[in-house]
Amino acid sequence: AYLKTSGGKGYHVVVPWRPAAGWDAFYAFARRVAEVMEQKWPERYTANMRKNRRAGKIFIDWARNGRGATSVAPYSLRARPGAKVSMPIAWEELDTVAPDGVDIREALRRLGERDPWEGFFRQDQILR
């Protein structure tokens, strides 16, 4: 799995899969992962979409995996003040790079560094 900033309020965990399963299978898998995280660590995570039920917890937005759902692509500029970028980051940076912590200047600087998603397209994972 790979990590990127959203350029907004959260992070996105991206898993490269071979296209072998349909939308329903991916959606069900993402929902189940969110449910397990919520059950195992209820004080930390929630899969509940209601904002008033998730205060102080990390929201696992499994619905982003449904057909027709949208998500910002890596390296995309956000239409927000400060020219924030959805930027691939290394897992080791999770504690130091905020979800909206990469602006266009920082993104351009990072392009000259090692790619934290190196090997992404060589993954051979399949969801059954």
Roles of regions detected by a PLM:
Residues 1-7, 48-52:
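Short beta-strand
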Residues 14-26:
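Catalytic palm subdomain of template-directed nucleic-acid polymerases
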Residues 24-128:
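C-terminal accessory nucleic-acid interaction domains of nucleic acid-metabolism proteins
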Residues 5-15:
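Short, conserved phosphate-binding/catalytic loop or strand-edge motifs used
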